UniProtKB/Swiss-Prot annotation:
Organism classification: Bacteria, Bacillati, Bacillota, Clostridia, Lachnospirales
Species this chain originates from: Lachnoclostridium phytofermentans (strain ATCC 700394 / DSM 18823 / ISDg) (Clostridium phytofermentans)
Membership in a protein family: Belongs to the YqgF nuclease family.
GO annotation terms (biological process): rRNA 5'-end processing
A UniProt-annotated Pfam family: RuvX
GO cellular component annotations of the record: cytosol
Name by which UniProt lists this protein: Putative pre-16S rRNA nuclease
Subcellular location: Cytoplasm
Coiled-coil regions listed in the entry: none
GO molecular function, one term: nuclease activity
EC number: 3.1.-.-
Major location (coarse): cytoplasm
SMART domains in UniProt: YqgFc
């Protein structure tokens, strides 16, 4: 079983999947949305990926403001999380994604990636950063629990 990471945006949804050991995140695709208000096709594609990769949990980027408040984008992510829960029956974790897209752009700029290619992969890379942060959190939590039991 694996964990899916999503970077939800008004035009695209970046998708990443963990390995079966839940140690690393790999970007798998960017879902192009037809309209910000229509989710049916987006949710259908996510469901296909859930089945294909045997996903048991979803981590959704939660774009809080830099001062830790909840803005319009975060509210839209909360709504999308609820749609995901209802449609898939899976647990959905909202994960602080502040600066993940900025970090993705920095990585792509450092690699001298063309603008066209950058636009194709930035959301997928942001989803990788979101999921990898969550996987690292789980790994560290597990290590702390092992230490506590000694």
């Amino acid at each position: 079983m694996r964990i899916m990471g999503l970077d939800y945006g008004s035009v695209t949804v970046g998708v990443a999947i963990s390995d079966s050991l839940k140690l690393t995140a790999q970007g798998i695709e960017v879902i192009r949305r037809k309209s910000e208000t229509k989710l049916r096709q987006t949710l259908a594609r996510i469901e296909e990926l859930i089945k294909e990769y045997e996903v048991e949990e979803i981590v959704l980027g939660y774009p809080k403001n830099m001062n830790n408040t909840i803005g319009e984008r975060a509210e839209k992510s909360e709504e999308f999380a609820e749609h995901l829960r209802r449609r898939t029956g899976l647990p959905v974790v909202l994960w602080d994604e502040r600066l993940t897209t900025v970090a993705a752009h920095q990585v792509l700029n450092a690699g001298e990636v063309s603008l066209k290619k950058k636009m194709e992969v930035v959301d997928k890379l942001a989803a990788v950063f979101i999921l990898q942060g969550y996987l690292d959190y789980l790994s560290n939590k597990k290590k702390l629990n092992l230490t506590d039991s000694l």
